[in-house]
């Protein structure tokens, strides 16, 4: 006999329970702190959440959330997203920046693109990546410093792991979006911005003056995830990301990664969950 259909409300509850477990494991992995699922919100955690709430509610603070080259990032992302931008145009852009050259060649030699022979020349690397791979690589180089930005002890300790998660997540989100007929570049940039919100979150946690260790429980993990989603909407506006990305970010900011969300939000959800699982069980320990 066919299995009974799970009511939508119950399905959402089951999804939320699974999401909470992954959020807890991920936060413990990111902070390199032991997880205690039932840990309550202690004084230090409550102070951190209050500071994040004040940050989200303060428009004057939004311009200083993350470092940003105001005259560079928005027009560059718009150019990358423009379908009329030719591969030759992007190639010229890359050739002018040694950091971009190195990253393009590195990506062309990654497991995703690897060929039988090593790629050592820029022209060959660009042929291997194609226009979509090149767009993603340029966006990655431009936005990575915004995620790796300097902070206190906690952010410094977590930066390497945060970028590992970000790198996996952005590529997974792009792949999921592409497979469902949506814009892969929008999904890629949205994932980068979503994890940039973690940088802001960790920097805020670093400002909490308390010597007590962090209590990493489900309640704290879920509360941080909600505030990360609120911050995503702010960051998308501040960076002047493409309009479609800002709209999706606003939805995430209002409703989180909901089970009944729009398709672009579900792509972000899928990439985030899978990247977290991969990091929790296969990343650095």
Feature locations, PLM:
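Conserved alpha-helical "signature site"
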Residues: 1-206, 214-285
């Amino acid at each position: 006999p066919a299995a009974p259909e799970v009511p939508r409300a119950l399905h959402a509850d089951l999804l939320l329970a699974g999401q909470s477990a992954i959020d807890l494991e991920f936060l413990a992995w990111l902070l390199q702190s032991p997880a205690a699922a039932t840990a309550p919100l202690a004084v230090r955690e409550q102070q951190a959440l209050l500071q994040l709430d004040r940050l989200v509610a303060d428009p004057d603070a939004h311009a200083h959330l993350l470092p940003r080259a105001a005259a560079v990032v928005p027009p560059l992302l718009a150019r990358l997203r423009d379908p009329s931008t030719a591969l030759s145009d992007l190639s010229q852009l890359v050739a002018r920046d040694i950091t971009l050259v190195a990253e393009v060649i590195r990506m062309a030699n990654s497991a995703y693109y690897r060929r039988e022979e090593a790629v050592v020349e820029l022209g060959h690397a660009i042929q291997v990546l194609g226009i979509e791979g090149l767009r993603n690589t340029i966006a990655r180089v431009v936005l990575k410093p915004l995620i790796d930005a300097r902070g206190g002890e906690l952010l410094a300790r977590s930066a390497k792991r945060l970028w590992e998660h970000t790198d996996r997540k952005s590529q997974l989100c792009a792949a999921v979006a592409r497979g469902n007929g949506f814009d892969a570049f929008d999904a890629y940039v949205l994932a980068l911005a979503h994890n940039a919100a973690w940088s802001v979150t960790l920097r805020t946690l670093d400002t909490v003056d308390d010597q007590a260790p962090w209590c990493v429980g489900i309640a704290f993990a879920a509360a941080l995830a909600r505030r990360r989603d609120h911050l995503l909407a702010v960051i998308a506006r501040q960076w002047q990301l493409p309009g479609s990305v800002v709209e999706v970010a606003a939805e995430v900011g209002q409703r989180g990664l909901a089970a009944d969300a729009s398709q672009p939000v579900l792509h972000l959800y899928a990439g985030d969950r899978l990247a977290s699982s991969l990091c929790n069980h296969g990343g650095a320990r």
